[in-house]
Amino acid sequence: MAGLRARGGPGPGLLALSALGFCLMLQVSAKRPPKTPPCPPSCSCTRDTAFCVDSKAVPRNLPSEVISLTLVNAAFSEIQDGAFSHLPLLQFLLLNSNKFTLIGDNAFTGLSHLQYLFIENNDIWALSKFTFRGLKSLTHLSLANNNLQTLPRDIFRPLDILNDLDLRGNSLNCDCKVKWLVEWLAHTNTTVAPIYCASPPRFQEHKVQDLPLREFDCITTDFVLYQTLAFPAVSAEPFLYSSDLYLALAQPGVSACTILKWDYVERQLRDYDRIPAPSAVHCKPMVVDSQLYVVVAQLFGGSYIYHWDPNTTRFTRLQDIDPQRVRKPNDLEAFRIDGDWYFAVADSSKAGATSLYRWHQNGFYSHQALHPWHRDTDLEFVDGEGKPRLIVSSSSQAPVIYQWSRTQKQFVAQGEVTQVPDAQAVKHFRAGRDSYLCLSRYIGDSKILRWEGTRFSEVQALPSRGSLALQPFLVGGRRYLALGSDFSFTQIYQWDEGRQKFVRFQELAVQAPRAFCYMPAGDAQLLLAPSFKGQTLVYRHIVVDLSA
């Protein structure tokens, strides 16, 4: 029985056959060719390289070990966010002779090992600011022979170790958008081949590296809507009282003089108080001997002077203005001469006379009647060369100039501004040593006149059909003129020092403005535009760097 094999166990022959089969399998396996790496039809691939022609998109089915990719004559126009993120080992990328026009933000995100990036001979007209974000290993970048006219500011900032940059063969427009590049080229350690401007004509064929920074005039300004006051108004007067900033608005539509207070925390105008005024045309605040008064001029129902009582924190009526002297007020001007306070009221009624009032101890008293029966529309006080003057515009004759007589302590007629017989409003400003008048007209052109020593001469005419309001003002060394109209938008002009004229600067959508008021409020420079038909708008003056 010892020679018998156990039941169910393999015999020697079967074991030998199994061993032979295993050996044959090993031989067959050893002769099988290596597996072909994945490769799209438009590409030729090896284990670590890919060369693609006429691709309709960034190829996705590529070997994961690819470190070099070339795209030629691709049929798509934009490289989008993360287009190559599936190739994290990529070290070399060539994009040549493609139809690209735009490369977006984060287009090369995920390529932290990329060292060489060549984007050449394409039709790229724009790069996004963060196109090259994430390329921390990039040492060589070529953007040669594309259609680039500008480059976003600081586009190369993410490229910490960039050694070589090629921007040749582009159509760079050397305007303010390129100023940053000139500054960067002057300080970078990156080697950059010479590049040249294609435009503007004055810089054409100039080397970008050699452009003087002083040739770039890139700082401009703008008036942007800052706050909307949801009510009409016909006058606006800012004033300081007890270190706070306020604004008085005449609002006949709500039968009040509205007082707003500037909130320095919220940086907005807030409701503060109201003075009853059913037909107010002007609310003039005056701070005399630390006391606040508001002269309320009304078309009907009489005009009054109110006093602010700090103990009761309310306005109380202090004084009535004789309705026989002030019948139909249209404008109000307050000023100080030789230490005394005055205000003048322009009377637009046929039987009225513009009147001057003087402060004396506890009230304002009639001091002088000026210019009777001429339907006066506006007043402008001018204190220049030590000679206080009051200019009165009228709808029935040329503006009249009065000069203060210190002997008589009254205004004495000095002459007329004959160039503008029907001015609605009159304002003045100084530029250098010259004095100018701005006169608005409802029909015809508004005029800018310059004082020539003995007379005014016209220097400029501004189209202004339907104008009842204009205002020159100065903001940070820049001089502007706001010119309103009942039939079109408000025009903002800026003074050109070289030409000694105003040039059109900006258009503001203000309906039927009745005044313009410049109001500095901390670091905010504000222009208020009270509207007779719509909302009162507050614009902020901002400085814009076009090279940013």
UniProtKB/Swiss-Prot annotation:
<dbReference type="InterPro" id="IPR003591">
    <property type="entry name" value="Leu-rich_rpt_typical-subtyp"/>
</dbReference>
<dbReference type="InterPro" id="IPR009039">
    <property type="entry name" value="EAR"/>
</dbReference>
<feature type="signal peptide">
    <location>
        <begin position="1"/>
        <end position="30"/>
    </location>
</feature>
<feature type="domain" description="LRRNT">
    <location>
        <begin position="31"/>
        <end position="64"/>
    </location>
</feature>
<comment type="subunit">
    <text>Interacts with STX1A.</text>
</comment>
<keyword id="KW-0964">Secreted</keyword>
<feature type="repeat" description="EAR 5">
    <location>
        <begin position="410"/>
        <end position="453"/>
    </location>
</feature>
<dbReference type="Pfam" id="PF03736">
    <property type="entry name" value="EPTP"/>
</dbReference>
<keyword id="KW-0225">Disease variant</keyword>
<feature type="repeat" description="LRR 2">
    <location>
        <begin position="113"/>
        <end position="134"/>
    </location>
</feature>
<keyword id="KW-0433">Leucine-rich repeat</keyword>
<feature type="repeat" description="LRR 1">
    <location>
        <begin position="89"/>
        <end position="110"/>
    </location>
</feature>
<feature type="repeat" description="EAR 7">
    <location>
        <begin position="501"/>
        <end position="543"/>
    </location>
</feature>
<dbReference type="Pfam" id="PF13855">
    <property type="entry name" value="LRR_8"/>
</dbReference>
<dbReference type="InterPro" id="IPR051295">
    <property type="entry name" value="LGI_related"/>
</dbReference>
<feature type="repeat" description="EAR 3">
    <location>
        <begin position="314"/>
        <end position="361"/>
    </location>
</feature>
<keyword id="KW-0966">Cell projection</keyword>
<feature type="repeat" description="LRR 3">
    <location>
        <begin position="137"/>
        <end position="158"/>
    </location>
</feature>
<keyword id="KW-0732">Signal</keyword>
<keyword id="KW-0677">Repeat</keyword>
<dbReference type="InterPro" id="IPR000483">
    <property type="entry name" value="Cys-rich_flank_reg_C"/>
</dbReference>
<keyword id="KW-0991">Intellectual disability</keyword>
<feature type="repeat" description="EAR 4">
    <location>
        <begin position="363"/>
        <end position="406"/>
    </location>
</feature>
<dbReference type="GO" id="GO:0005615">
    <property type="term" value="C:extracellular space"/>
</dbReference>
<keyword id="KW-0325">Glycoprotein</keyword>
<dbReference type="InterPro" id="IPR032675">
    <property type="entry name" value="LRR_dom_sf"/>
</dbReference>
<feature type="glycosylation site" description="N-linked (GlcNAc...) asparagine">
    <location>
        <position position="189"/>
    </location>
</feature>
<feature type="repeat" description="EAR 2">
    <location>
        <begin position="268"/>
        <end position="310"/>
    </location>
</feature>
<feature type="glycosylation site" description="N-linked (GlcNAc...) asparagine">
    <location>
        <position position="311"/>
    </location>
</feature>
<dbReference type="GO" id="GO:0005576">
    <property type="term" value="C:extracellular region"/>
</dbReference>
<feature type="domain" description="LRRCT">
    <location>
        <begin position="170"/>
        <end position="220"/>
    </location>
</feature>
<dbReference type="GO" id="GO:0017157">
    <property type="term" value="P:regulation of exocytosis"/>
</dbReference>
<keyword id="KW-0771">Synaptosome</keyword>
<keyword id="KW-0268">Exocytosis</keyword>
<feature type="repeat" description="EAR 1">
    <location>
        <begin position="222"/>
        <end position="264"/>
    </location>
</feature>
<dbReference type="InterPro" id="IPR001611">
    <property type="entry name" value="Leu-rich_rpt"/>
</dbReference>
<keyword id="KW-0968">Cytoplasmic vesicle</keyword>
<dbReference type="GO" id="GO:0008021">
    <property type="term" value="C:synaptic vesicle"/>
</dbReference>
<dbReference type="GO" id="GO:0044224">
    <property type="term" value="C:juxtaparanode region of axon"/>
</dbReference>
<feature type="repeat" description="EAR 6">
    <location>
        <begin position="455"/>
        <end position="497"/>
    </location>
</feature>
<keyword id="KW-0770">Synapse</keyword>
<dbReference type="InterPro" id="IPR005492">
    <property type="entry name" value="EPTP"/>
</dbReference>
